[in-house]
């Protein structure tokens, strides 16, 4: 039996999808899996999520592929799934399986030669989420928080190539790289 799996096209999403495939194949060797890579609306913009529609931007095209029978299942990072799985009028989908939880912590990546204790008032630290922003400002209210979007590779490249001192990312993302 062939299972078509809708996934975002980013390397991290593909890694997660391959984890799902390994789990499926461990249950029954008779399954063949095909990854259907989809560019989500959330991947196509650099604007902050709160300005453009929130987390649903990452899942809507994947769910459309399910409703059009172009895919049999979709793999999402749970942080990208809105609390309502489908807008009114769409097919309703269910979460039927989850991989074991990865490391839940955040990490700070710093420019080469910068140590955490070197961060001072005005240090520019990039992050994408309001929780991380609040935590950084609790450490030092004079940090300059820079909004950042993009997949993990894009964010790391921005840290290296732009005027940033640090970047906050999920440890799980770093583990999967």
Protein language model regions, located:
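Domain-level signature for soluble enzymes in the chorismate/prephenate branch of the shikimate pathway
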Residues: 1-177
């Amino acid at each position: 039996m062939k299972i078509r799996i809708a996934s975002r096209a980013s390397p991290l999403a593909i890694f997660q999808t391959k984890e799902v495939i390994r789990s499926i194949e461990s249950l029954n060797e008779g399954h063949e899996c095909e990854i259907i890579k989809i560019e989500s609306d959330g991947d196509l913009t650099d604007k902050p999520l709160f300005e453009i529609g929130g987390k649903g931007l990452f899942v809507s095209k994947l769910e459309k592929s399910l409703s059009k029978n172009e895919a049999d299942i979709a793999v999402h990072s749970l942080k990208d799934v809105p609390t309502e799985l489908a807008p009114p009028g769409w097919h309703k989908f269910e979460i039927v399986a989850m991989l074991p939880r990865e490391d839940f912590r955040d990490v700070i990546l710093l420019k080469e030669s910068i140590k955490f204790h070197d961060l001072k008032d005005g240090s520019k630290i990039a992050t994408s989420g309001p929780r991380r922003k609040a935590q950084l400002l609790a450490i030092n209210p004079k940090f300059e928080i820079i909004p950042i979007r993009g997949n993990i590779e894009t964010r790391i490249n921005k840290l290296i190539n732009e005027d940033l001192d640090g970047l906050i990312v999920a440890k799980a993302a770093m583990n999967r790289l």
